[in-house]
């Protein structure tokens, strides 16, 4: 909604459609009943309504290639392609990328079966420890385990019970580090970088750092 409000300030913007949108957004844009993951329907709507520019914001359609689909249809789109979005959609990829290029990151190991993950956690025997689903999980794919049993339960729930679906086919078992978390985002066209102001995301669902 904030993006839509800002775009409306531009004299170049005549009309904005949002799919699927919500009650609040309907005050500023025309909401369209299309699933955000439905690339074919989204492209068809854009063509039929003479859309000049598409802004793809959510993680899931970015990872699924919505920007790619729009650009293939000749519609300029803002957002990373599926290949670029993998740095967000796969924690395994992003951790390995940081390791490859010497970018400081918490120590970690990657596992694709629960038995190996639990064996490593038992051998490591250091807590708290962090268990992360590889794929997208609506921001809830990270579990901080305070003890061995909690770590085993986390591995079981992610890899065997599939609480995050296929996003839990692989996991990252990561060193727990403390300190303030800061998000720094930037806009880029591949040549120029324009940083935004820093921000802090409150990860827990409940007060007093409780919940996932």
Model-identified regions with their sequence ranges:
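Short, charged, surface-exposed secondary-structure boundary motifs
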Residues: 27-29, 43, 86-92, 206-208
């Amino acid at each position: 909604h904030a993006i839509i409000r800002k775009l409306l300030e531009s004299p170049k913007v005549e009309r904005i459609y949002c799919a699927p949108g919500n009650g609040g957004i309907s005050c500023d844009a025309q909401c369209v009943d299309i699933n955000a993951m439905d690339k074919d329907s989204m492209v068809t709507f854009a063509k039929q309504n003479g859309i000049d520019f598409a802004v793809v914001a959510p993680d899931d359609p970015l990872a699924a290639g919505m920007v790619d689909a729009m650009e293939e249809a000749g519609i300029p789109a803002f957002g990373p392609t599926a290949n670029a979005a993998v740095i967000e959609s796969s924690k395994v990829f992003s951790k390995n990328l940081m390791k490859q290029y010497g970018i400081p990151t918490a120590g970690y190991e990657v596992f694709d079966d629960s038995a190996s993950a639990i064996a490593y956690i038992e051998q490591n025997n250091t807590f708290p420890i962090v268990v992360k689903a590889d794929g997208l999980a609506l921001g809830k794919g990270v579990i901080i385990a305070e003890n061995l049993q909690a770590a085993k339960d986390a591995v079981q729930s992610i890899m065997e019970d599939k609480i995050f679906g296929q996003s839990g086919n692989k996991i990252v078992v990561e060193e727990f580090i403390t300190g303030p978390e800061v998000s720094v985002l930037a806009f880029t066209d591949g040549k120029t970088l324009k940083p935004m102001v820093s921000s802090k995301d409150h990860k827990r669902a409940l007060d007093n750092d409780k919940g996932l």
